[in-house]
């Protein structure tokens, strides 16, 4: 089996984490790190408490703690919304091999707007950045949008992409 076999289950879990974040009064973002079909770590958004505590940041830190290394080569990061620039740089620093997100973020996405996840030039700064990860966007977008629509975060989703 490969990572693609687990994409739907892991993305569904991210959407559940996003809903849990909304239920506790925070922004609707959930993320997790997996490798070889095994859940390594999860993260719920906690930016209401600390502005840099995005779901991806927490999932990456938790994966680092669990695995005992900051080299997460071979891991996939799943997230309910496209990672922002800060999270995208962290994904590159942790050397994540694959990123799967549900909702595009046309105003602040680290992939669709700022191209950080695809930027091959960052590789020249080894050992700080890993190679560009494989990126799959729009996975279970409709389901993630249902959670997003419970909040004022209307600007996320493919319908808001600039033409």
Where are these regions (language model features)?
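Zinc-dependent deaminase
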Residues: 1-21, 90-163
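Glycine-rich phosphate-binding loop at the start of an alpha helix
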Residues: 8, 15, 53, 57, ...
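Short, flexible loop/turn motifs enriched in small residues
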Residues: 24-28
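Short beta-strand scaffold segments in enzyme catalytic cores
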Residues: 29-37
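Short beta->alpha transition motifs characteristic of CBS
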Residues: 40-47
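Residues that line or immediately flank small-molecule/substrate-binding pockets and catalytic motifs
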Residues: 47, 79, 103
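Helix-adjacent hinge/juxtasegments
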Residues: 61-98
């Amino acid at each position: 089996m490969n990572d693609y076999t687990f994409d739907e289950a892991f993305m569904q879990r991210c959407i559940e984490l996003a809903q849990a974040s909304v239920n506790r009064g925070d922004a609707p973002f959930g993320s997790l790190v997996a490798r070889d079909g095994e859940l390594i770590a999860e993260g719920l958004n906690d930016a209401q408490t600390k502005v840099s505590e995005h779901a991806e940041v927490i999932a990456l830190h938790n994966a680092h703690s669990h695995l005992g290394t900051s080299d997460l080569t071979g891991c996939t990061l799943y997230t309910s919304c496209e990672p922002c620039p800060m999270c995208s740089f962290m994904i590159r620093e942790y050397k994540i091999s694959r990123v799967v997100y549900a909702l595009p973020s046309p105003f602040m996405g680290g992939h669709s707007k700022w191209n950080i996840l695809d930027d091959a030039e960052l590789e020249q700064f080894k050992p700080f950045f890993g190679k560009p990860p494989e990126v799959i966007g729009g996975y279970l977008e409709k389901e993630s949008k249902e959670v997003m629509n419970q909040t004022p975060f209307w600007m996320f989703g493919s319908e808001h992409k600039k033409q």
